[in-house]
Amino acid sequence: SYRALIIAGPSEKGQELAEIVNSGKELTWDELDSANWGVMSSSSPAGYVYPSLWLQDKYGKGLTDLSSAVQSDSYASALARLASGQVDCILAYADVRRDYEDKWESEFGAKNSIWEDTNVIGVTDPIYNDTVCVSKNSKNMNDDLKAAIQKALINIGNTDEGKEVISIYSHKGYQEAQSSDYDKERDAQKLIKELSK
């Protein structure tokens, strides 16, 4: 799993929001709504869906309720807009700053490092990107087979050879999950259905 971040940039408004959070206070909806936002496509888990759920959980509002939100076609363009002050906040996957650290100053024109210029002002629930699932409807599936598959996959991820095999998926290993671990994913799927109406 990974998380999405709500990242405030170097603009005056971005720094104002970061200062509030860094002082230990909660941001209000009006404070968030006063910013210019950079969002990704409505199908993006980290750049739209999970941050929208975060807003719903905290404020009872969604991204569509923001007064000023522009869609970016890539995380690079979102960060370029953030660096230039065109937007005050962006929504992105947790490692985005590390992935674009070199480009922040060299290509996006920022004056300081990405770590000096940006602040995390929100963190979403975990996003479960990849899963191994079994069918509840299969006549061949039973608890013993389910446990054996689970154990085998976890064991594969615990060996050097297995890690090499699963690295093609950028996986580092597997762990047991419960149905309740995916409650937020169910909420995300509901939101996606609503957005596509």
Provide a role label for each language-model segment.
Residues G62-A80:
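Short helix-initiation/N-cap motifs at beta->coil->alpha
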Residues S1-L5, F108-K146, Q150, S167-E176:
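Periplasmic-binding protein-like
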Residues S1-A46, P51-Q56:
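A conserved helix-loop-strand patch within extracytoplasmic ligand-binding domains
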Residues W54-D57, A83-S84, D88-W115:
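A ligand-binding cleft/hinge motif common to bilobed small-molecule-binding domains
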Residues L32, L82-A83:
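Hydrophobic residues within well-ordered alpha-helices
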